Amino acid sequence: MKRVLCALIFCLVCVLAVDVNAQTWPSRPFKLIVPTGPGAATDVMARMLADGVSRKLDQPMVVENIPGASGIVAHQTVARAAPDGYTFLFTNTSGLAINLISFKQLPYDPTKDFTAVAMVCNQGPQMISVNAELPVKTLSDLIAYAKANRGKLSIAFDTTAGAAAFGAKLFNRRADLGLVEVPYRSAAQMTQDVASGVNQVMISSVAAAQSVVDAGKVRRIAITSKTRFRGLPDLPAVSETLPGIAVDGFFAIVAPAGTPADIVARLNREIAEYLKSPEIQQRLISFGLATEGAGTPAGTAQFIRNEQDHWRALAQELDVEPQ
């Protein structure tokens, strides 16, 4: 009887401790680590989110930029942080999926070192665009023109956005176009080179191409998401012409593995409320992104696992070897 009583008391203490934890968190400023430098689109989104969450929780969510090494340093930092609810990571497709297949050894485990908190964006497509003087207006036109001029056209992509490189290779090989693949380390330089005709085709984020599209120097012809992007509803998806080709990105919030479930649930609720705002949804669309809401922590974790499986399959198809 005494043992049973002790066990009941222990359980009660644990329940009360969780409840107190949920009520008192956050009692001080907490960090949101961002794997890019200040001013990048990812950083702008993270700061926008942090500002909204800070106001809801009455504590500053402080953005800390840790750029470099394909986001590896930032992810390693969060993976090693104390799971106390005061360190979170604004992560993306590259950090949790593409790095997994791009590097033989990572100093963090994308599948074990993090606790999923919430989705921010589940649609972050790439876009296929062409130099405005190229005599093509649709994806079918481009496919026919490339095959008729095999080896004479090039497709540029930004290697700092891992999804773009995969998208370029997938499109080129599945359609058997024979495009010369030209990697760039700078999206700005890439877009200018396509605008000036150095390269004829590019795959980029919607936002990266916006200025040259607005200037009339580049024509967008297709989007790489599974379905049409809500921000550009008249732009066809690649899959409408080439079924099965889809390259999408995501952004999510994760925490160090072992972060208390009640804290994770609380932050998830606040992010969910924030993302419901039509103004915020419109701002995300201006970045070339879309959201269906924060989802649940469990749903976010499953989404990430599905994405990891998807990118592994793509890497195998494209014979991409980890470095």
Indicate residue ranges for each PLM-predicted region.
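Positively charged n-region of N-terminal signal peptides that target proteins for export
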Residues: M1-V4
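Bacterial N-terminal signal peptides
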Residues: C6-L16
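Sec/Tat signal peptide C-region and signal peptidase I cleavage site
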Residues: L16-A22
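N-terminal (or domain-start) structured segment
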Residues: A22-K112, K152, D176-S205, V212, ...
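An extracytoplasmic/periplasmic, membrane-proximal ligand-sensing/linker region
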Residues: S27-P29, R173-L177, A261-Q323
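Residue-level signal for nonpolar/aromatic packing positions in well-ordered secondary structure
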Residues: F30-L32, G39, A46, V63, ...
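Hinge/capping helix and adjacent helix->loop/strand transition within the periplasmic-binding protein
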Residues: R80-Y86, I101-Q189, V238, P243, ...
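A ligand-binding cleft/hinge motif common to bilobed small-molecule-binding domains
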Residues: S94-Q105, A165, K169-R174, V201-D234
